[in-house]
Amino acid sequence: MAAPRRGKASSTVLSSLPLQMLLCLSGTYYALYFLATLLLLVYKSQVFTYPHSCLVLDLTLLFLMGILEAIRLYFGTTGNLMEAEVPLAASLVLTVGSALLSAYFLLWQTLVLRADSALGAPLLALHGLEAVLQVVAIAAFVS
């Protein structure tokens, strides 16, 4: 009979399957959201009177949001699968930042169309659900 090894990980799996599924769904949805929002910005700049400075600001924020989203999804997936609190907490902080940028594109953009609202509301809902599941997963990892 072998003695238990020191430092061996427990056999209990603590990573959250619903969180992992939501992260995958969020990554896919964000790719579509990014392309649709980019096309909507091009449409708005051609059809409507859209100030150049506001267009530059919106494009900059959209690309910043894309970078932030990629980092957030990486940390969230890594933290969940490795059952590590620090990357998951970093993803939670980035989720708040990404939700604020989503709210900007949903509410405070220079020109908000119904298509922007239809695209932004599910993204904001995904961020909210992910934040709740990340808090639950962090609590499970800590205890």
Swiss-Prot record:
Subcellular location: Membrane; Cell projection, Cilium
Main location: membrane
Top-level taxon: Eukaryota
Keyword annotations of the record: Cell projection, Membrane, Transmembrane, Transmembrane helix
A Gene Ontology biological process term: non-motile cilium assembly
A Pfam family of this chain: Transmemb_17
Record's bilayer topology term: Multi-pass membrane protein
Transmembrane listed as a keyword: yes
Transmembrane portions of the chain: 22-42, 47-67, 88-108, 122-142
Range of residues in the leader sequence: none
Record InterPro entries: Uncharacterised_TM-17
Gene Ontology CC entries for this record: ciliary transition zone; membrane
Keyword Membrane among UniProt keywords: yes
Protein name as it appears in the record: Transmembrane protein 80
Organismal lineage: Eukaryota, Metazoa, Chordata, Craniata, Vertebrata
Gene that this polypeptide is encoded by: TMEM80
